[in-house]
C-alpha cells in the first residue's frame, strides 16, 4: 500500500506571530477610518465621503500607521476666520501626537467646515438625551447660527476671553471641546434666541439640559454680553431679568438672584469689565458698576459704584478709583492690603 505522508497542522510560532503582525496593521488603521466615516455622517452639511488613509508599508509599525492618517476632502477648509483655522491646526496636531484622539477630533472639528458647524455638533452631543436626540439638537443649533450670525461672533469673543484670562488654557481647541463654562454660555445664547422668538417651551427645555449637564443655571430670559468668561462655572445661577455686560469674568458658585415674589425686573445688572469672585451672591435689581471687583464669598445687597472693590457679608466698599478692567487681569486681591484682618 502506498504510504501517504502526514503533515502537521501546526504552524511554527514565529510564522504565526509574523503573519498576525502583518494582518493587524492595516485593519487597525482601516478600523479608524470606518469609525470616522460613521461619526462623520452625523455632521450636517458635510459631503458623504470616506476618510482616506495613506498606504503604509508593512515594515512600519501600527503606531506609525495611525500617525500617518491623511484627512482629505473639503472639510475644515482654509477661510478668513483665523479662529477656525487655528482650531483646525490644533486638532490636526493633537490627532498626530495622540492617535487615540483621531476619531474624536475628526468628528468634533475636522469633519466640519466652520466654527458654527463644529460648535453646533459639540453642543448637540453634550446636551442630547434618550428623548432629545443629538440629530434634533444639531438641526436646532445649526438653524439658529445661520439665522443670527451674532451668536458666532459672540462665541469667538468668549473664546478669546478665556484664552486671554485663563493661564491654565493654552489652546483654543481646549476651550471649544473641554471648557464647560464656554459651552454653557454658547448653549444659553441659543436658548435666549429661542426665548426672544417666543419659543419658550423649547428654550426652557434647553435651559434644563444645560443645568443638568453643565451645572450652570442661566434663565433663557437673561441677557449676557460678549467676551464673558465663566471660569470653572459649576454652581453659577443667573436669573431671568439679570444683565451681564461685555468683558465680565465670573467664577464658580456665583448667584445673580432676585428677592421676594415680585415678577418684574428683579435681578442684578453687572457692568462691563467686572470680575466676580467665587461664591459671590448678588441679590435684587441692583447695579454693579463697570470695572468693579467683588471679592470671593461676598454677599452684595446694595449698588456698587464704578471702579470699586467690595468684599464681605454684607459687602462693603474697600476701595474706589480702580480704572483698569479687573475682569481682564483676573486680579481679585489688589487693593485689599490695608484691610484689618484681626478677628
Task: Map each language-model feature to its residues.
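Terminal amphipathic alpha-helical/low-complexity segments used for targeting or macromolecular assembly
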Residues: 2-209, 325-343
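Structural signal for interior beta-strand "rungs" in well-ordered beta-sheet cores
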Residues: 211-318
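Alpha-helical subdomain
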Residues: 271, 306, 316-317, 323, ...
Amino acid at each position: 500500500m502506498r504510504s501517504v505522508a502526514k503533515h502537521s497542522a501546526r504552524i511554527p510560532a514565529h510564522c504565526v506571530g509574523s503573519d498576525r503582525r502583518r494582518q493587524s496593521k492595516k485593519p487597525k488603521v482601516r478600523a479608524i477610518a470606518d469609525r470616522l466615516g460613521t461619526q462623520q455622517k452625523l455632521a450636517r452639511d458635510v459631503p458623504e465621503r470616506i476618510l482616506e488613509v495613506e498606504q503604509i508599508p508593512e515594515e512600519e509599525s501600527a503606531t506609525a500607521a495611525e500617525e500617518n492618517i491623511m484627512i482629505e476632502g473639503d472639510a475644515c477648509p482654509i477661510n478668513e476666520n483665523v479662529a477656525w483655522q487655528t482650531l483646525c491646526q490644533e486638532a490636526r496636531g493633537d490627532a498626530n501626537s495622540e492617535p487615540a484622539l483621531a476619531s474624536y477630533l475628526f468628528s468634533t472639528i475636522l469633519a466640519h467646515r466652520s466654527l458654527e458647524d463644529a460648535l453646533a455638533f459639540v453642543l448637540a452631543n453634550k446636551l442630547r438625551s434618550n428623548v432629545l436626540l443629538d440629530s434634533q439638537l444639531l438641526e436646532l443649533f445649526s438653524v439658529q447660527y445661520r439665522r443670527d450670525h451674532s451668536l458666532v461672533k459672540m462665541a469667538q469673543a468668549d473664546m478669546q476671553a478665556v484664552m486671554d484670562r485663563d493661564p491654565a488654557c493654552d489652546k483654543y481647541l481646549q476651550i471649544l471641546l473641554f471648557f464647560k463654562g464656554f459651552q454653557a454660555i454658547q448653549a444659553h445664547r441659543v436658548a435666549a434666541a429661542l426665548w426672544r422668538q417666543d419659543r419658550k417651551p423649547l428654550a426652557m427645555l434647553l435651559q434644563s439640559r444645560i443645568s443638568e449637564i453643565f451645572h450652570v443655571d442661566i434663565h433663557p430670559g437673561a441677557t449676557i454680553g460678549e467676551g464673558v468668561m465663566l471660569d470653572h462655572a459649576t454652581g453659577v445661577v443667573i436669573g431671568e431679568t439679570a444683565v451681564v455686560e461685555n468683558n465680565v469674568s465670573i467664577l464658580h458658585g456665583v448667584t445673580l438672584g432676585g428677592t421676594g415674589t415680585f415678577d418684574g425686573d428683579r435681578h442684578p445688572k453687572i457692568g462691563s469689565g467686572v470680575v466676580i469672585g467665587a461664591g459671590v451672591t448678588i441679590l435684587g435689581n441692583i447695579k454693579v458698576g463697570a470695572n468693579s471687583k467683588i471679592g470671593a464669598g461676598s454677599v452684595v445687597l446694595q449698588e456698587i459704584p464704578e471702579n470699586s472693590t467690595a468684599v464681605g457679608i454684607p459687602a462693603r466698599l474697600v476701595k474706589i478709583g480702580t480704572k483698569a478692567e479687573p475682569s481682564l487681569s483676573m486680579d481679585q486681591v489688589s487693593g485689599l492690603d490695608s484691610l484689618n484682618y484681626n478677628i
